[in-house]
């Protein structure tokens, strides 16, 4: 068996196209333009690349992009004052604070200063709690992207056994909550899980989000399972730097029914879902129906 390759790049392009259609409809029918504000503190090179990509794609789908690039020495009071202004700006429907923040800033305090309705990363404690109790919330972008691809590939997820390897607040925990919401039977595995391979082999859906290069091999995969690889790891191989996931693609693809590659799998979905969340936030703020299929 050779697994079907789930093309996240193509799927993300489809999501962005759908968002662009809905944005055009909002403009034409209601005179509303969704706005996304991205806040970057400091000059971390990777963060600068991410912020640039987010701004570019925001404009491409017809939204307004607001970029706030602050010096590394920005005080907590200055950052919180900016967030307060964005919270009260009617042109801004989504706010994203690029992480990590410089060490002198309290990330939890900053994230929880956001208006939960504009927290398009889904990290505010209110959104975390609402997701956990099955209420309408802003859903973290990467798990949302995984869910969209799973729904597209499998249709209904109800009754399937799902194993999420990783328990981070950004991916593992919200992914488990989303799968519970789809009526999966969910196991969250982690570094202390005994006989991890055996646990994973019980999964119809296996989500790897543990941050360890190629840890999940074909021996961990149930024949025919759907494998979602969230990992992004840079390793040295044959004198070159290579990007790999948490799954050993070659061996897992021999067993799985479908699998996401790295790169080109989950990664492109993250920004696409950020745009979808901004659209959703805009619709909610204006009392308009949310587009179907773009949120949990």
From Swiss-Prot:
<keyword id="KW-0486">Methionine biosynthesis</keyword>
<comment type="subunit">
    <text>Homodimer.</text>
</comment>
<comment type="pathway">
    <text>One-carbon metabolism; tetrahydrofolate interconversion.</text>
</comment>
<keyword id="KW-0378">Hydrolase</keyword>
<dbReference type="GO" id="GO:0006164">
    <property type="term" value="P:purine nucleotide biosynthetic process"/>
</dbReference>
<keyword id="KW-0521">NADP</keyword>
<dbReference type="Pfam" id="PF02882">
    <property type="entry name" value="THF_DHG_CYH_C"/>
</dbReference>
<dbReference type="InterPro" id="IPR046346">
    <property type="entry name" value="Aminoacid_DH-like_N_sf"/>
</dbReference>
<comment type="function">
    <text>Catalyzes the oxidation of 5,10-methylenetetrahydrofolate to 5,10-methenyltetrahydrofolate and then the hydrolysis of 5,10-methenyltetrahydrofolate to 10-formyltetrahydrofolate.</text>
</comment>
<dbReference type="GO" id="GO:0004488">
    <property type="term" value="F:methylenetetrahydrofolate dehydrogenase (NADP+) activity"/>
</dbReference>
<keyword id="KW-0368">Histidine biosynthesis</keyword>
<dbReference type="GO" id="GO:0005829">
    <property type="term" value="C:cytosol"/>
</dbReference>
<keyword id="KW-0554">One-carbon metabolism</keyword>
<keyword id="KW-0511">Multifunctional enzyme</keyword>
<feature type="binding site">
    <location>
        <position position="232"/>
    </location>
    <ligand>
        <name>NADP(+)</name>
    </ligand>
</feature>
<feature type="binding site">
    <location>
        <position position="191"/>
    </location>
    <ligand>
        <name>NADP(+)</name>
    </ligand>
</feature>
<dbReference type="InterPro" id="IPR000672">
    <property type="entry name" value="THF_DH/CycHdrlase"/>
</dbReference>
<dbReference type="InterPro" id="IPR020867">
    <property type="entry name" value="THF_DH/CycHdrlase_CS"/>
</dbReference>
<feature type="binding site">
    <location>
        <begin position="166"/>
        <end position="168"/>
    </location>
    <ligand>
        <name>NADP(+)</name>
    </ligand>
</feature>
<keyword id="KW-0028">Amino-acid biosynthesis</keyword>
<protein>
    <recommendedName>
        <fullName>Bifunctional protein FolD</fullName>
        <ecNumber>1.5.1.5</ecNumber>
        <ecNumber>3.5.4.9</ecNumber>
    </recommendedName>
</protein>
<dbReference type="Pfam" id="PF00763">
    <property type="entry name" value="THF_DHG_CYH"/>
</dbReference>
<dbReference type="InterPro" id="IPR036291">
    <property type="entry name" value="NAD(P)-bd_dom_sf"/>
</dbReference>
<keyword id="KW-0658">Purine biosynthesis</keyword>
<dbReference type="InterPro" id="IPR020630">
    <property type="entry name" value="THF_DH/CycHdrlase_cat_dom"/>
</dbReference>
<dbReference type="GO" id="GO:0035999">
    <property type="term" value="P:tetrahydrofolate interconversion"/>
</dbReference>
<dbReference type="GO" id="GO:0000105">
    <property type="term" value="P:L-histidine biosynthetic process"/>
</dbReference>
<dbReference type="GO" id="GO:0009086">
    <property type="term" value="P:methionine biosynthetic process"/>
</dbReference>
<dbReference type="GO" id="GO:0004477">
    <property type="term" value="F:methenyltetrahydrofolate cyclohydrolase activity"/>
</dbReference>
<keyword id="KW-0560">Oxidoreductase</keyword>
<dbReference type="InterPro" id="IPR020631">
    <property type="entry name" value="THF_DH/CycHdrlase_NAD-bd_dom"/>
</dbReference>
<comment type="similarity">
    <text>Belongs to the tetrahydrofolate dehydrogenase/cyclohydrolase family.</text>
</comment>
